[in-house]
C-alpha cells in the first residue's frame, strides 16, 4: 500500500489542508493519506488542552474521503507529556504499516524551511521523501533532504488567519460548528 503522512498541528484544520491532501491523492496516486495531528509540537507554543479537539476536528473534516485516515499515534507516543517529534512518529508508522523504504511526507514550505532544526533531522532525512507544498515562504535549497516541490497552486489560508479573523469556512461547516459548540479560539 502506498501511503503518505500529513502531520501538523491542524489548529484548526482548514480547506487548504484538505486541498493539499486531495491533490496528493490525485497526482501521486497514494492509496491512503494519514493525517497525524501533533500532540505536543516542539516547534509551536500551543495549548495542549486543545489536542483532543484538534484531533476530533481533523476526524470531522476528513470523514468524506475514505482514503483519509486520522492517526492518534502522536497522542499515544506523547501520553507521558513528551513532545511530538516527527522522527519518532515516522519510525512508528513505518513499523505499523511495514514500510521498508522511505515514507512520503506532506509538508508546507514554511515548515520545510526550518527542517534542519528539527529533532535529529539528519536521521529523519534518511527515512522520508518530502512532498513540499507552497505556503508563501521562499524555500532555500536543503542539501541532504529527499524532496520535491508539488506543482499545486498556492492557497492563501492559514489556521492562524482563521482563528484571528474568525473567518467562515464554508467547506468545513461541521468543524465550524464543533469550534462554536466547544467555545474554542475565543
Regions found by a protein language model. Name each.
Residues 1-186:
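Nucleotidyltransferase catalytic core that binds NTPs
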Amino acid at each position: 500500500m502506498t501511503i503518505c503522512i500529513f502531520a501538523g498541528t491542524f489548529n484548526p484544520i482548514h480547506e487548504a489542508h484538505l486541498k493539499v491532501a486531495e491533490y496528493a491523492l490525485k497526482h501521486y496516486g497514494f492509496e491512503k493519506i494519514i493525517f497525524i495531528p501533533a500532540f505536543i509540537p516542539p516547534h509551536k507554543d500551543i495549548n495542549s488542552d486543545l489536542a483532543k479537539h484538534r484531533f476530533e476536528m481533523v476526524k470531522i473534516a476528513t470523514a468524506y474521503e475514505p482514503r483519509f485516515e486520522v492517526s492518534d499515534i502522536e497522542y499515544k507516543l506523547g501520553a507521558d507529556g513528551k513532545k511530538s517529534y516527527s522522527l519518532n512518529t515516522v519510525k512508528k508508522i513505518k513499523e505499523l504499516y511495514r514500510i521498508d523504504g522511505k515514507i512520503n511526507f506532506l509538508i508546507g514550505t514554511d515548515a520545510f524551511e526550518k527542517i534542519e532544526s528539527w529533532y535529529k533531522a539528519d536521521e529523519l532525512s534518511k527515512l522520508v521523501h518530502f512532498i513540499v507544498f507552497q505556503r508563501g515562504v521562499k524555500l532555500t535549497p536543503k542539501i541532504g533532504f529527499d524532496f520535491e516541490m508539488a506543482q499545486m497552486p498556492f492557497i492563501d489560508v492559514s489556521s492562524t488567519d482563521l482563528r484571528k479573523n474568525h473567518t467562515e469556512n464554508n467547506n468545513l461547516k461541521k468543524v465550524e460548528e464543533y469550534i462554536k459548540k466547544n467555545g474554542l479560539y475565543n
